[in-house]
Amino acid sequence: QTNLGLAYLDRIRGERADNLELAITAFNLSLEVYTPDSFPYEWARPQNNLGTAYSNRIRGERADNLELAIVAYNLSLEVLTRDAFPYEWARIQNNLGNAYSQRIRGERAENLELAIVAYNQSLEVYTRDAFPYEWANTQNNLGTAYSNRIRGERAENLELAIVACNLSLEVLTRDAFPYEWAREQNNLGAAYIDRIQGDIVENIETAIFCYQEALKIRTFDAFPLDWATTQNNLGNAYSERIRGNKAENIENAIVCYQEALQIYTRQAFPRDWAETQYNLANTLRERFKLLGKVTDIQQAINSYKQAREIIEKTEDKTLYFNYSYQLGKALFEGGYYTEAIEHLENCQQLYQKQKDISSLAPILLELARLYHRTGRLEQARLYFKDSLRLFRRLGDQDNVASVTTALGNLEIQIGKISQACSHLKEAQTYYQENNDKERLEEINHLLKILQSA
């Protein structure tokens, strides 16, 4: 039954979901005979295999499947100890690290720490000299965990991720292991796009190069899902690109997202589809700001709404309200003010309950701008003042200057001259210190209006 389960686990023909269910059934049948007391080794092996099957399972709740995988791996480790079975122990530690990296339940930060511990334990046995392929693959997994790590210094974690990816590439060369090489190029691109150290322009260019390298192997025909993942990542890199023509970079990003959506369909990959729709919406908004095509903002709004429908069904409330916030901003930019206010007020209520001032402050600012635009000036002033108070608490001087400028402009309109002067002078000082000529020109124009008032 164990061998049959392994055959189904690796099977290429037939539906992948069906094969995994058959593998799980076979492993469970073998466990009815192989008990930990009578056949400890034979019992432990299918536990590890069962963990792998649950990790990859398509049917059932993803969160439940990962919990079952973690239980199975830990049961296996009770028998397959480092001293008695070092190779098997290291393999299970690597598998356990993968399960913790993907885990949905529990605290995300803690899960990633557990993954990093498991990978490092695996590397105590999987050395480069003894097991080069396994060592390189575990370095890859460790790099991904460091890229996603929440604890510790973000900049340091990303440097550790880049080191791990480059170590992996010393073994996983394009000629010897093309699939793994492409995967590593994709992961390296992800680390560079987020990198804090080094020159930001060069980091983005390196990320684009890595993604383009990955796509030489990750083709639509050979590896459609991997191809879609890298297309989405490349789209993100073009969206952030500083070099080159802005309009051209935006067009390249849109093409990448649209390519990814050929594979990431709503039915087959709802979460990936939603995230790519969100990325596409962000980029369409940028094109709308650049070219003013109404169809772009309308399409962006539609993409946000569709993406939000999927995210609403998940347990990720933070992501759902972030999508709502961006939808509210898009509605504002498109001139749909009533609907924009409705969405942003819903977000405001959530973040007030959570006492999340870093998310609440920009929402209050957007609402202030909306109320200002729609002529509800006193309400706008209150929201500007509330957002200003929070930005001061956060020490966000750039947004403090932005709010004091907007508030000063509003106060000129409602005749609060002394308050307007005070706020505009504060913003003027900040922009002088930062040599922001464009914003200074705006402030000086408003101060001239004040002098003639």
Where are these regions (language model features)?
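Conserved alpha-helical positions within TPR/SEL1-like repeat arrays
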Residues: 2-10, 41-56, 87-102, 133-148, ...
